[in-house]
Structure formats: C-alpha cells, structure tokens
C-alpha cells in the first residue's frame, strides 16, 4: 500500500484522494502537521526535498505535485484509460485543463485567499479580479460540455472539482457562472470520493470563520 502524506483540508491532497478512489487504490494516509514543521524534518526532506504535500511513496518511489500523482495513479492502477486516455488529442486537452487548474485557477485562489487567511492581510481587489477571470475562462471551456475535457470523467474534472469546491467554502459565488455551476453539480454526483473531498473542504472552511 502506498504511503500518502497529506492534510485533509488541502485541495491538491483531496484531488489525489478522489483519483485513488476512482482507480480503486487504497492509500496509507499519513497526516503531516505543517504548523509543527513536520514537513521540514530530515526524514521527510529525504522523501521530498521540496517539502510539499501531497507526497506519495509507492513501494519506494516518491512523487509529489498532485496532478503528477493523479496521472501516475491512473497510468499504473487504472483498469481502463478512461480517466487519462492514451489518445494524444484527448490527453492534450486533459493536460491543458490540469495546467490551467495549477497555473491559473488554483493559483488565483492562493494569491487572493492565502494572504488573508495565513497573514491576516486585507483583501486585494486586483487578485479577486484574477479569480473572476479564471472562472470566466473555465465557464467558456465548459460551454456545451458535461465534463471538463471530453465526454466523460477524467483527472481534469477531479483536479478542478477539488479546486472549485474549495472556492465554494471560501464563499466565492460559483452560481454566477452558469456552465461551471452545471458542471460542478454533476461532478459532485459522479466523482468517486466526493464525500471525503467535501469533508476536507469543511475542515478548510474553518480558516474563513
């Protein structure tokens, strides 16, 4: 069983948990207390010198960056390739959505909310505009689409639903974006591990209360 270093509230960690559920892989979950500096201990730095979560250790093979872990789990353990198809064009669209999630959507969350939550900084209106812009892009991607990349659930949906649900508990109005809202309501029903994802979201919500 693969060791999985994580925090339940972390969106990237939740995307891996849902992907593991989708491919039927059990994870040996190991909570990492970042506030206590457990990620900076020599034994963890030996596993992941970047000292980030999530981190997976599968039979001695260490990997971090949630979207890389998602793809690895599907390629190694998926009974089919439906979550990450081998077709170059289908895979390219999924990759684009994953990179969009990492570099644009979730990045906008971090840039706007993290300074407020962790540094008690005032809200930055310019950073909020970046969130709105990211959601407008996602709304356009989802025009006429039930899923984020193609016509069935993929790792792109799983990564994006982890991010979008985090925006929801932060109080962002997802309903303003009709295509995103419709996709999100469907994703809640069809994504394996949604319940655990939402429990993690509610844990993260405490930072906003």
From Swiss-Prot:
Its EC number is 2.5.1.18, 4.5.1.1. It holds the Pfam family GST_C. Homodimer. GO terms for biological process: glutathione metabolic process. This is Glutathione S-transferase 1-1. The lineage of its organism: Eukaryota, Metazoa, Ecdysozoa, Arthropoda, Hexapoda. It catalyses: RX + glutathione = an S-substituted glutathione + a halide anion + H(+); 1,1,1-trichloro-2,2-bis(4-chlorophenyl)ethane = 1,1-dichloro-2,2-bis(4-chlorophenyl)ethylene + chloride + H(+). One of its GO terms (molecular function) is glutathione transferase activity. Keywords: Lyase, Transferase. It comes from Drosophila simulans (Fruit fly). Belongs to the GST superfamily. Theta family. Glutathione binds at residues 10, 51-53, 65-67. Residues 87-209 form the GST C-terminal domain. It comes from the Eukaryota. Conjugation of reduced glutathione to a wide number of exogenous and endogenous hydrophobic electrophiles. Has DDT dehydrochlorinase activity. Residues 1-81 form the GST N-terminal domain.
